[in-house]
């Protein structure tokens, strides 16, 4: 009998050989991570046309559309519980969407947005509404007729068609092919929860792919409903996953994303939903930005506080997230401190700039000194230069010749944009940190 591990390995080798010469997005979309808003984190099933349009209106009035938040994505619970008995098509719940989905899509388009829909690659959606498994083409045609620009495609009630990468790939490819046959450009966002090594094959059929179970509005609290701590646990991702849990999984996947493939999706943002502190939300947004996750708001934008708006409006971090042609920042090291970790990330940007971030997951503030030889471990020639480092939260600029010093709050992050200044003489370099 052929083992599951053998099938997994065979399929991964097949993908590498078959797609090694593929360049660019599979459908020409998603050359940078998508930005927008999704209804699920805040509203779950409690959605209707007014909620969707009011959030879109607030996004535009707050200037967030101008910053790139262009997709308005309606999540689960929008449809009737049964398909149309005559046509077989999905239909909107008339109590929630009395004017129909196409009418709402037109209103969003007229406001300058792109419109996103939700379905599942299963018999039912996660909330028990009709799914698209075995109905891919008729549903894709319906979405295209409604003017849909984006599809979030979930993984619930998949009838056991998972557990082996090839099986999951084929199930999700059916909708990919169906969307492409419509002739309408539709961004394809897999919500496959990181199962079956989706980061190894998602880029061949989609524009982004989830790498974890559902996010929960907490920084680092462990939850038995999110049993996986690392990406190796690929078959039981669960939900109620903390920000740090998801960062831990994403940290090892920087090579799997980019303009020539697609994007690791760390799930929608929780900023503004009230479960974390200001410092923790800053860390949440910073790490999503530099890891080049999609930046999808998940709050009630119409009641967003000035501090929450400050976080999601950080133009410098958004520009790094949207920097075309660059890959996610990479985890350089992860050092134990107490029960938690201190982590260093760096990544190349356009014009030979770099993004550098130090994350302090510990329960106390720390003073740190990070040396250039650590930051540029993959490009040591850069350690021979002086650098101008701009703090991307307070805009302070400092000259860095040997190491950069930082006071990092508990559950906080310090993030800089490094710009080359001049060549210098080298000194001995080391890493150190001390209690604040």
UniProtKB/Swiss-Prot annotation:
Its EC number is 3.2.1.22. Glycans are attached at residues 84, 180. This is Alpha-galactosidase mel1. It comes from Schizosaccharomyces pombe (strain 972 / ATCC 24843). Secreted alpha-galactosidase required for catabolic conversion of melibiose to glucose and galactose. It comes from the Eukaryota. The active site is at residues 154, 214. Keywords: Disulfide bond, Endoplasmic reticulum, Glycoprotein, Glycosidase, Hydrolase, Secreted, Signal. The lineage of its organism: Eukaryota, Fungi, Dikarya, Ascomycota, Taphrinomycotina. GO terms for molecular function: alpha-galactosidase activity. Belongs to the glycosyl hydrolase 27 family. Residues 1-24 form the signal peptide. Disulfide bonds join 45-77, 126-156. The gene is mel1. GO terms for biological process: melibiose catabolic process. It is found in: Endoplasmic reticulum lumen; Secreted. GO terms for cellular component: endoplasmic reticulum lumen; extracellular region. It catalyses: Hydrolysis of terminal, non-reducing alpha-D-galactose residues in alpha-D-galactosides, including galactose oligosaccharides, galactomannans and galactolipids. Its main location: endoplasmic reticulum.
